[in-house]
Amino acid sequence: MAKWLRDYLSFGGRRPPPQPPTPDYTESDILRAYRAQKNLDFEDPYEDAESRLEPDPAGPGDSKNPGDAKYGSPKHRLIKVEAADMARAKALLGGPGEELEADTEYLDPFDAQPHPAPPDDGYMEPYDAQWVMSELPGRGVQLYDTPYEEQDPETADGPPSGQKPRQSRMPQEDERPADEYDQPWEWKKDHISRAFAVQFDSPEWERTPGSAKELRRPPPRSPQPAERVDPALPLEKQPWFHGPLNRADAESLLSLCKEGSYLVRLSETNPQDCSLSLRSSQGFLHLKFARTRENQVVLGQHSGPFPSVPELVLHYSSRPLPVQGAEHLALLYPVVTQTP
């Protein structure tokens, strides 16, 4: 009876039945830190703020948990600024007379500003030049620059009456002499052709024999004409034979003469033989005449045999000597003896 009264009248207080624990759906600090770092690592700095997803109410943006603010986004973020906005900002911040500096950043094609047209320097692309020539067939297009020519003050104001300034630079309208050096080859070609025509049509050309008109091979380089040598005179009576003359005296005589001068003297080692003393550009040459078994006279190893010394001298007075060191020389100027 007492138990029933206590339960019915609630004298001792009625306890509620035990309830299950309330689940905790909040994320742990470690999980929130991981997600915040992941968002920072894979964040697109150029993504518009409007297109970003709203943060989770229970995430780091929830104001109910002030301790979670340390996992928010960093303060220094990359923000995309349009080129037009950047130019307007520079114009507002800079002075009225200050020129806008060229944007040195890399821009997307749609952000690039149109550049001013480059100055005309006379150069034209082949395709453009072809298009201009096809579009303007009746108008002469000047593809090359003309040289600058100073004009007189009076001609710059206007040409005098009855005279027309020379603006054309064609060869047939050129007033300069025909032998000027700055003319190209094509301008002188006509003058050269006329000069050759006058030369070939002249009476002197008609009187020349036909064999001379033929194209001949140029003769080998030969020395200039030498003084005449008479091979009929014996060696002792030749004016260039000096008899017993030593080498020093021969060089003293040749030192006063020019290149190609020569004399014949008796040899110092063998008075029965003769020697040739020659003046060259490099000094003096002393060559000894030798005789073969047939009693022929030779000069060096490559010389042909001759009956006498005067004939050998006559032969090499018009031909180079076949001697090493004197291949370009000939016996041109004999040094005659001085009679008392």
From Swiss-Prot:
Membrane-spanning ranges: none
Domain SH2: from-to ranges: 240-335
Listed PROSITE patterns: SH2 (PS50001)
Highest rank taxon of the organism: Eukaryota
Record keywords, A-Z: Phosphoprotein, SH2 domain
Basic and acidic residues bias locations: 171-186
CDD domains linked to this entry: SH2_SHD
Entry-linked InterPro entries: SH2, SH2_dom_sf, SH2_domain_adapters, SHD_SH2
Family matches, as Pfam families: SH2 (PF00017)
Modification after translation, per record: Tyrosine phosphorylated by ABL.
Gene Ontology MF terms in the entry: phosphotyrosine residue binding
Region of interest (Disordered), residue spans: 1-77, 94-186, 198-230
Phosphoprotein found in the keyword field: yes
Composition bias, Acidic residues: 98-108
Functional summary from the UniProt entry: May function as an adapter protein.
Protein name, per record: SH2 domain-containing adapter protein D
Organism: Homo sapiens
